[in-house]
């Protein structure tokens, strides 16, 4: 027997996501109720210029209660193509654009959210500023690629999506590590 979803109830609808309670029959036949954060999906972008500088953003994150160093990222609009979202987000958050290639995808925390994230490497960067969200206060920070991986070893980068993105992009970034 497999997990069987029996019913879903919306218990909260917010600006970005909603919360559902999901009635499930477990593989052993017993019932269970799960809380699920239903999310439209998101993207993370790893922007790297021709000199091997990575573009990060530093911003306050309410869940962490402090400023974090992160790759540019954003939430997709309903039915938005992930690549189009990535193109928009990198411009809004860093003021740069370039050629984007997908380096992977992942589920952020599948134990409680449906959020699926697509990860893109942006190269051949050029200025292309777009106005960002009114509630975002970001500082763009550039760091050489090889320094970024030293920072990871020293536990100075602790945003999960950023760490995953940097791991998936590593094969594309080795040329900047010499």
Feature roles, as predicted:
Residues 2, 34, 43-88:
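Conserved Nudix-box catalytic region and its N-terminal flanking loop in Nudix hydrolases
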Residues 8-11, 104-109:
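Short, solvent-exposed loop/turn elements at beta->coil junctions and helix N-caps
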Residues 13, 18, 41, 113-116, ...:
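A generic structural signal for well-ordered coil/turn residues at beta-strand boundaries
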Residues 56, 71-102, 120, 134-135, ...:
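The catalytic Nudix box helix
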């Amino acid at each position: 027997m497999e997990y069987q979803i029996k019913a879903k109830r919306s218990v909260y609808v917010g600006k970005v996501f909603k919360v559902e309670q999901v009635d499930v029959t477990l593989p052993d036949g017993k019932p269970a109720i799960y809380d699920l954060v239903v999310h439209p999906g998101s993207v993370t972008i790893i922007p790297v210029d021709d000199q091997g500088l990575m573009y990060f953003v530093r911003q306050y994150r309410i869940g962490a209660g402090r400023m974090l160093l992160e790759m540019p990222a954003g939430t997709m609009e309903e039915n938005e193509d992930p690549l189009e979202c990535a193109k928009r987000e990198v411009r809004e958050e860093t003021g740069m654009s370039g050629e984007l290639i997908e380096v992977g995808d992942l589920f952020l925390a599948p134990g409680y959210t449906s959020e699926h994230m697509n990860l893109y490497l942006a190269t051949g960067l050029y200025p292309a500023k777009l106005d960002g969200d009114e509630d975002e206060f970001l500082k763009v920070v550039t760091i050489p690629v090889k320094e970024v991986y030293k920072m990871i070893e020293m536990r100075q980068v602790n945003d999960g999506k950023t760490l995953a993105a940097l791991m998936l992009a590593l094969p594309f970034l080795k040329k900047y590590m010499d």
